[in-house]
Each structure stands twice: as C-alpha cells, then as structure tokens.
Amino acid sequence: MQNSHLSQQRFSDLALHRSVQQAIKEKGFEFCTPIQALSLPITLKGQDIAGQAQTGTGKTIAFLTATFHHLLQKNNINSSEQPRALILAPTRELVVQIANDANFLVQATGLKTGLAYGGEGYDKQLKVIDQGIDILIGTTGRVIDYVKQGIIRLDYIQVVVLDEADRMFDLGFIRDIRYLLRKCPVPQQRLTMLFSATLSYKVRELAFEHMNDPQYVEIEPLQKTGHRIREELFYPSNQDKMALLMTLLEEEWPERCIIFSNTKHRCEEIWGYLSADGHRVGLLTGDVMQKKRLSLLKQFTDGTLDILVATDVAARGLHIPDVTHVFNYDLPDDCEDYVHRIGRTGRAGESGISISFACEEYAINLPAIEEYIGHSIPVSQYDAKALIEDLPTPHRIKRGAFDSRSNLQRTIKRLKKTY
C-alpha cells in the first residue's frame, strides 16, 4: 500500500520515447507518483491496465505519457487523418482538463489532439477534427454523434483510455462506452487503459469484456479522506447555517475555497449572500453554460475568484490546484461524494481543511458517511451569540447568458415568433 506523494521511480529510468522523455524533463517531473510508477512499466510494454486511483494522484499524466509513447513507437504515418487514440471522460470539464494537461506533450511531439464534448463549440470542434488528429478526447455522447454522422471512424484506434470509469457508470454512460468500444479494433489489437476511483464489480466486468488480460493496479490511501486533510464538523441549526458559514470564512480567511451544496437553489442562495458581502465568488451548477463554466474555473485557478460555490458537478475529475478549504454546507446524500468533495483539497502533497455542517436537514447522512470513511469526524462547537448578525441582502442571479435553460427558453420564443 502506497501512501507517499512520490515514489522512488524516476521518469528518466523508464523506456519512454525520446520526445516524451524530453517533454517530461522540461516539465520538471523527476519522480513518478505511485500510480505512475506502477502503471507505466506495464503500459509501456503494451499491456492493458485497470488502475484504481483517486483524482490528484497523477493518473492523467500516467495515461497521457503511455498514450503518446505508444503512438510514437508505432511510428506510422496517420494518412487517414482519423484518430489513433480515444480518451473518454465523464464530463466536459474533465475533457478540457485532460487536453490542457496534454499540451506540453503535444508541443514536444507534434501529435495533434481534438476535443468532442457537448454544450458548445460544435463547429470549432469539427474544424479541428477535419484537419486530422491523432488523439480524440471527449465525452461519450458527442463522440457517438460524430461516429454516427461518419465524421469520425474508430477503425484506426490503437489506444483507448477510460478515465473515471466508475463515474461514467454512475452517470449512465455504460451503454455508450460499450457501443464505442465495439467500434474500435478488438482488444488484442489495441492498448486499453482504464482508471477508476474504485474497481467495483461492474468496472471489473467492463474490463473483462473489453480489455486484453489487463493488469490490475491499486493505489488506495490509508484512509479514504486523506491524512493531509483536517476534518471538522459543526451541528448548526438551519437558522444559523449562513451566519456560521460567513463567520468561519471571516475567521479562516481561506486562500482558495470550494463550498458544496446539494441543490442548485441552495448554491444560488449561498452565492447571493457571499457576493453581497463583497467576496470574490463564482457559481458552478449544472445550468451554467459551458463557456461560462470554463471561464469560472480559469478565474478560480488564476486567483481572480477566491470562492467557488458548486454542486457535485465539480466534485470529481477536475484538477484545481491549491484549494486550501472545502466546506460541505450540506452533507451529501452519497458517501462517495463526501470523499470526492473534500478530496479537492490536500492534493499533491499539500495539506487542506474540510469543514462540514450537519444541519437539521442533512445530519441523517452523517452515520453512513462516517462508516464509509472509517472514522468519526471531529466535532467543534460554536457560540450562536458570536456569529455574524447583520447578514447582507443577498444578490439575485441575473438570468440570461448565465444559464443554459434561459438560453433555450429564449430560442424557443424566437422560433415561435418566426413561425
């Protein structure tokens, strides 16, 4: 069982293609993380792998390195201009993040990547794909759309990557995954890599069906919540929740913070109070347009925003560095979501703080969460008289370009007027 951030395995000791090796060196990577140290010696030999690893463990670089190495080792000219590698991820944000992480390898090797995800950018994505690509990174729905239209053929695929496989199961994408894998060459004629936070029975079944005798690699922390994360729990009344949150933000003064709530409406309420109080805060929910979502994530990463209020859409798969604090304004209904939420902090060897509210509505979720993580969350008390009393009048969300539902409604109205 590995529990350190880096292993003793050096990238320079791996039999990587020289262009990939040089890119890794220039990027400043010297030692592998545990998942990289265990998976790369297998995948560089062309063997399939099913790896268990949480986000933030370096698995993206593990499969990107292997993918670029494999395509370069084949050393065949892509005259078809069709993709030779297919990387599937559950969300468009993760697709974009993987593409960003691959940029240094793209620049060093000359291999070309294309994106395929829903929400926006259809024409832009098509333009890139039409020019010929080596690696397609996408969500299942948009990739299937391109395949059925004949825009993309998967006959030339040499590498397949399934990232966050368990999450794709949770979102109901398994039929889409199987459809795409059947369009690819048979498992014996390609390298397939699967990564998942858990290697559950259903994930292993998928590996058995569509992989060629995969090697199983598991990197599991000593405790599910990570030993670098300081957890804290409060029992506020529903009436005190907002005042307690704003008081703690004033006391903790987090450098970069994510506040999770279970519903879009509650997220908007939290955003309204914090925005009115002068905090640099962004709102990330399922209704936010893709362009706006990417802009928010960039502002948060760049430090233009200090706080991000989000539903679980941002809890998994996104690489957001240097998050110092995570607040569970609502305890999640799903135990795994608790782990993935607080896993936004304490990444890459850094420490982090997680503060959760077990309120009247969601305290019922606490026993199952503590059983799942294997320990009780330390409880802290608060003095209701010491909480901030004069809460500001919350700002209201301005509907418009901000949310996709409003855009759809406006489009329908225009069509009705036209016809």
Swiss-Prot record:
It catalyses: ATP + H2O = ADP + phosphate + H(+). InterPro entries: DEAD/DEAH_box_helicase_dom (IPR011545), DEAD_box_RNA_helicase (IPR050079), Helicase_ATP-bd (IPR014001), Helicase_C-like (IPR001650), P-loop_NTPase (IPR027417), RNA-helicase_DEAD-box_CS (IPR000629), RNA_helicase_ATP-dep_RhlB (IPR023554), RNA_helicase_DEAD_Q_motif (IPR014014). ATP binds at A53, Q54, T55, G56, T57, G58, K59, T60. It is found in: Cytoplasm. Its EC number is 3.6.4.13. One of its GO terms (biological process) is RNA catabolic process. It comes from the Bacteria. Keywords: ATP-binding, Cytoplasm, Helicase, Hydrolase, Nucleotide-binding, RNA-binding. Residues 40-217 form the Helicase ATP-binding domain. One of its GO terms (cellular component) is cytosol. A motif (DEAD box) lies at residues 163-166. Its main location: cytoplasm. A motif (Q motif) lies at residues 9-37. Residues 241-388 form the Helicase C-terminal domain. HAMAP family: DEAD_helicase_RhlB. Component of the RNA degradosome, which is a multiprotein complex involved in RNA processing and mRNA degradation. PANTHER family: ATP-DEPENDENT RNA HELICASE RHLB (PTHR47959:SF10), ATP-DEPENDENT RNA HELICASE RHLE-RELATED (PTHR47959). Belongs to the DEAD box helicase family. RhlB subfamily. DEAD-box RNA helicase involved in RNA degradation. Has RNA-dependent ATPase activity and unwinds double-stranded RNA. This is ATP-dependent RNA helicase RhlB. It comes from Histophilus somni (strain 129Pt).
